[in-house]
């Protein structure tokens, strides 16, 4: 009897150990995929009917503002797309200006550099973007392309670089101070600076720097609840100003680039930038969002260090692109007549990846913290899907 009891006890321990090991393996699999697998797929043949190459992307001729979204801030491919798409807009759609989700003052210094003004170097221009996420070779390549283009262009054909964010006011103040130094004038406060500069010919861009400084002051005093709403409202207002400013020199399209969540035509819980722009410009505002099958994303860690973490979007379209071995593909939501099944999918809620400039271990165990569940056709006019998004290499 004692031997039988000991044997049963031994077997019981083995079973418990096996179940514990299986639970650990299941947990590891869950936090790796954000579920027990990377999600569902759509029919391969249906997907192939509508999938296009990036080079084949076309947008309507009436578009005034073209927006390129990014599913994360920490992937090389999404930054490379900024240059790829901007070059296409310049060469095929008479686009003369690019605006980035970055502080206005820093981008004004970049604009001076690409126009050959002042003593700033290419390194200075990249550094002026301030946000760590932009200290990359990919953003340097975009700035270099614009600077090289302008060296060969007539003054009225030159490209311009703008920022529509206002989270750092230091460079806004620097630009305003430089303007008043050049004018040999003084200002009492930033309201006075904005009012004075807007009435002086050639100083409109510096007046906008003063306005962005004031926006930052309001944003700094906002509650956590109101912060995102105020920021996105001002970003929409700034893009509207940039577009109108661009038209004064030479009527042309404006390309903007920011996170998917900012540029999307529909907001989730509050009115974001893209929704405001869509309400004003309607079909003249054209948005291409992005997503990934798998991302190894560069994210902020503790003590200012950068880390890389892996996530899966569970996007059925991205899963299909992965299964077909398509590194990067484009779906134009207005050209889905060849596949009613795909058209039906993008007009229903589906999971998509979404990572900002923040990370917590909870992201690994709470998939909804890095995914959205929304209707693609209500957010975008088309989507670029990246199979495997690789991390950016931040230089500073």
State where each predicted segment sits:
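Juxtamembrane low-complexity tails/linkers enriched in Ser/Thr-Pro and polybasic
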Residues: 1-6
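Structured catalytic-domain cores with a bias toward divalent-metal coordination
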Residues: 8-396
């Amino acid at each position: 009897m004692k031997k039988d009891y000991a044997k049963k006890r031994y077997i019981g321990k083995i079973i418990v150990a096996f179940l514990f090991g299986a639970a650990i393996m299941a947990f590891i699999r869950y936090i790796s995929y954000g579920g027990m697998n990377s999600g569902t797929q759509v029919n391969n043949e249906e997907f192939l009917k509508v999938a296009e190459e990036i080079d084949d992307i076309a947008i309507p001729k009436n578009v005034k503002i073209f927006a390129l979204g990014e599913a994360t801030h920490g992937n090389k491919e999404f930054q490379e797309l900024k240059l790829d798409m901007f070059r296409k807009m310049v060469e095929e759609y008479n686009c003369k200006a690019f605006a980035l989700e970055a502080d206005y003052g820093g981008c004004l210094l970049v604009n001076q550099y690409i126009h050959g003004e002042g003593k700033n170097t290419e390194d200075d221009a990249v550094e002026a973007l301030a946000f760590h996420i932009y200290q990359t070779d990919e953003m340097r390549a975009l700035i270099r392309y614009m600077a090289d283009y302008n060296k060969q262009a007539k003054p009225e054909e030159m490209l311009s670089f703008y920022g529509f964010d206002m989270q750092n006011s230091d460079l806004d103040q620097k630009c305003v101070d430089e303007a008043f130094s050049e004018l040999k004038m003084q200002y009492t406060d930033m309201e006075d600076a904005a009012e004075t500069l807007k009435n002086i010919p050639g100083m409109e861009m510096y007046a906008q720097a003063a306005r962005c400084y004031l926006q930052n002051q309001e944003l700094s005093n906002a509650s956590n609840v109101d912060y995102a709403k105020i920021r996105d409202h001002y970003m929409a207002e700034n893009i509207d100003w940039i577009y109108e400013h661009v038209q004064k020199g030479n009527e042309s399209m404006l390309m903007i680039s920011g996170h998917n969540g900012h540029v999307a035509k529909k907001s989730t819980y509050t009115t974001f930038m893209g929704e405001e722009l869509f309400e004003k410009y309607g079909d003249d505002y054209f948005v291409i969002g992005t997503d990934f099958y798998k991302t190894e994303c560069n994210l902020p860690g503790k003590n200012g260090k950068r880390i890389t973490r892996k996530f899966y979007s569970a996007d059925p379209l991205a899963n299909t692109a992965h299964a077909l071995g398509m590194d990067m593909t484009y779906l134009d939501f207005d050209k889905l007549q060849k596949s009613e099944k795909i058209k039906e999918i993008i007009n229903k809620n589906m999971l998509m990846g979404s990572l900002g400039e923040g990370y917590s271990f909870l992201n690994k165990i709470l998939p909804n913290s890095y995914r959205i569940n929304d209707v693609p056709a209500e957010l975008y006019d088309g989507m670029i899907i990246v199979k495997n998004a690789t991390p950016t290499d931040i230089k500073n």
